[in-house]
Amino acid sequence: MSKKVLITSRSFGKISNEPLDILTGAGFEVTMKGKDFDQAEFEAMIPDYDALIIGAHEFPEAVMERCPKLKIICKHGAGLDNIHLEKAKELGIAVCNVPGTNSNAVADLTFGLMLAVARNIVSTNRWVHEGRWQTAIGVDVCG
């Protein structure tokens, strides 16, 4: 009997099928439930799974207690604030995450937001869509 993996992260496998191919190639039965997936459905499904790759869904202590088959929770992201770590440890469920994997994307977004503020991009975009053409004086980003 194959091990069952539930994936609730909306972005898991979006850029490449390689992560899914690795799991299925290793004999795992994979269920993807990222899009249009609510908390109640998650709580009803999870007791049947051996492994969980979780996104932003909350994984309350009470739900974790109803998961006798669950052996590992992997957070598809950096933060672990939606997983009750002490309860997982008590139940012998391993927990892991992927810290730092989004650091380039965070830096890119931060720089983009800095440019948007410095150059009034949001305001000037709105003005153009409203049919107005006005000049907004921005500041240089340097240093």
Where are the model-predicted features located?
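Phosphate-binding beta-alpha-beta segment of Rossmann-like dinucleotide-binding domains, i.e.
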Residues: L91, P99-G143
